[in-house]
Amino acid sequence: MTSTNDIRRSFLDYFGGAGHHIEPSAPLVPYNDPTLMFVNAGMVPFKNVFTGLEKRPYSTAASSQKCVRAGGKHNDLDNVGYTARHHTFFEMLGNFSFGDYFKEQAIHHAWTLITQTWGLAPEKLTATVYHTDDEAFDLWKKIAGLPDERIIRIPTSDNFWSMGDTGPCGPCSEIFYDHGDHVRGGPPGSPEEDGDRFVEIWNLVFMQYEQLPGGERVDLPRPSIDTGMGLERVAAVLQGVHDNYDTDTFKALIEASVELTGVRADEAHRASHRVIADHLRASSFLVADGVLPSNEGRGYVLRRIMRRAMRHAHLLGAKDPLMHRLLPSLTAEMGAAYPELIRAQPLIAETLEREEVKFRQTLDKGLRLLDEATADMGRGDTLVGDVAFKLYDTYGFPYDLTEDALRSKGISVDRAGFDAAMAQQKAAARAAWKGSGQKASEEIWFDLAETHGSTEFTGYTSTSGEATVIALVRDGQPVEEARAGDEVIVLTNQTPFYGESGGQMGDAGMIATLEGAKASVSDTGKPLGRLHTHQAKLEAGTLKVGDTVQLTVDAERRDRIRANHSATHLLHAALRNRLGGHVTQKGSLVAADRFRFDFSHPKALTAAEIADIEADVNAQIRGNEPVTTRLMTPDDAIAAGALALFGEKYGDEVRVLAMGKADDRNYSVELCGGTHVRALGDIALFKIVSESAVSSGVRRIEALTGEAARQWLNGRDEALKAAAAALKTSPDEVPARVAQLAEQLKKAERELADAKKALALGGSGGDGGAAAGPAVEQVGDVAFLAQVVDGLDPKELRGTVDGLKKQVGSGVAMLVAVNDGRASVAVGVTDDKTGHHSAVDLVKAAVVALGGQGGGGRPDMAQGGGPNGGAANDAVAAVKAALA
């Protein structure tokens, strides 16, 4: 049997031997593409190459690309586990030609690989072509020798591909494998095509046209090839099975699930084991690529996938978290091909376990609610959207999990009602994924880059220099000149100004000409990653395209940014050393006055951890080692141990920053295009000022360096001295004195609370005299005792009412506590009276009088409150009225 790993390797070896560049899989989160939530096809990383916005140093390529289809237009989540070929995570094998070879060679490569390298019988193969693509029809006859009846013309859009309403497009040709007439189904294009007999294994897209806005198609000057083949599908064919879940990778994962749950993958439980196997792959790869579970965007899709698998683990009777215990089986199957799985294994395991523990806390309650809501329903009925939304909002059930849970009962869910409830609760504040990246409308940058090429950056070695103005942009349009008072974007052929990227803010400074033009630069951008755009305001003179200018960076501001940026590298290394290799940078902001650093870690840092990390960084600063820079290829840099940041896109040559010493190695080695100090002593001082949560599994540190850190510490010192003076003690004694005062205050508050409680119960006052307690009165057929007290802690209400109940003996006791204008109320009913009067009903009457809503508890004791403390006596009257 040919393993899935062997198939992947042989595909890449074949095309590598045919002169193709072998492109590693891109992360699942698309780089700078606001139109996609996840990479969902092999061509996605090459999209800008196909559209001409990006140039690569090769014209042919092949890859095995990780893909996820579980959100947006391409969403296979609902079908996973119940069909033979649907997955949330899959691998797409593909070969690509960017204006190099076209149809004939694409068909030749496909036929040679599947029939000669993989040995599929030609008589088992059928091809489809777009109904007007005579060229492809003839090529299949010529190259493969297929008879006319096994080259099927398809007139539908299934065999015509387009990137969108406009842009590259072209006909497709698909290759199908025939499992034989013992399997149900007919050939493509027939009424029985949805059966399992004929399985599509490869799609060849011939990009030969450009779709224009008016609907016209014109020939592309350099037609291209985009092919895609699902690895799981072709593995099933080559391994002689009809079901992707019977292939070696899935069999290993399902066997592990069976072993850990003790439940066989029989007809009743097969879907659950398949869901778990598929969703384990998707969840693990998403976490490895930097996505963590949350309640919005990509993180919410991940949470939906995880929780769907976790419900199926619950169906299998798993008493303890299961998913993280299956992870070793996944890394054994796929870790060699995707080493990021092994690198991120601790983080993946912790994330899976934490999410499953969290979900299990509400899963049983939610399922009970679902059972109650559907107890009287039958097949064909619909669960109302309000209940589905309550399951989502209260118990963490994504909508599709509720759908999945009701699938076996044949009950559907009211999607419109669910959406209406969601909209009503969250309204405009609902967090919808909006993507990120360059605005598609900013075509001007593409035009300028094509005309002038990339801006040469000279700022690594200098903060000033001469340049030529190559473009001026005002209000989004190119202009030839700018005058005093104009706000304009200035582009030059070269610049020492750093353009904002990699979390580092852009430089500020001045632009001047010998003729007297003078412009202040407030910021520098870097659109497309190639241009440097100076955001400037002309203060004097006239600036024209073609002028020679002197560019001067604000050096003092740049130095502070350098220090903060180098400190982020030291902090990153310290975090990984202290907390573990699962720590990865999730984002940063490097400004002149401060910096923040976001990183993956499942819990808050302790005070001791923060102190240790701070000490580690400052020790490196005191060591004052020089910062070294080398230019390397990305592969060489990573092989040498450099950290590459998730989501960053690197060119053919990268800067590798090494700084500090740890035993016989550098303390930190990272790929980075930013500006840095020359020696670590230039940072001077490092101080963490806050540590907080950004989202589930992501923490944020905010820190200061140099003079900003010194001023912050001085401010704390002054505050400490002021506190010491107010406390009439020395600064060293402030903590002990504050603790002493806090204990005294706590004691005084306890004594005051006891006094108020005693007063409410009619106990003795502070002067030793007897205080008149509340009088018991007869209301209707029940004894009733009520008291209104100012300042009694609401937490004391129930205990105090228990005391009042004893005074009543048999009847109802009520206490209203007024604090800061609000009122809290508790009502107690003695056991012999709960059959006639419920404390819950009585307290609800009181709460309405106080301007509140709700209130609850038990028949013998209930509590509530309202905003109108002035209506305390009205609340007493309301309870009396309810008793009368």
Swiss-Prot record:
Name of protein: Alanine--tRNA ligase
Cofactor binding note from Swiss-Prot or TrEMBL: Binds 1 zinc ion per subunit.
Catalytic reaction equation(s): tRNA(Ala) + L-alanine + ATP = L-alanyl-tRNA(Ala) + AMP + diphosphate
PANTHER family to which the protein is assigned, alphabetical: ALANINE--TRNA LIGASE, CYTOPLASMIC, ALANYL-TRNA SYNTHETASE
Subcellular location: Cytoplasm
Function: Catalyzes the attachment of alanine to tRNA(Ala) in a two-step reaction: alanine is first activated by ATP to form Ala-AMP and then transferred to the acceptor end of tRNA(Ala). Also edits incorrectly charged Ser-tRNA(Ala) and Gly-tRNA(Ala) via its editing domain.
Primary localization class, coarse: cytoplasm
Domain remarks in the Swiss-Prot or TrEMBL record: Consists of three domains; the N-terminal catalytic domain, the editing domain and the C-terminal C-Ala domain. The editing domain removes incorrectly charged amino acids, while the C-Ala domain, along with tRNA(Ala), serves as a bridge to cooperatively bring together the editing and aminoacylation centers thus stimulating deacylation of misacylated tRNAs.
Keywords, comma-separated and alphabetical: Aminoacyl-tRNA synthetase, ATP-binding, Cytoplasm, Ligase, Metal-binding, Nucleotide-binding, Protein biosynthesis, RNA-binding, tRNA-binding, Zinc
Protein family (similarity comment): Belongs to the class-II aminoacyl-tRNA synthetase family.
BP GO terms, sorted: alanyl-tRNA aminoacylation; negative regulation of DNA-templated transcription
Single GO molecular function: tRNA binding
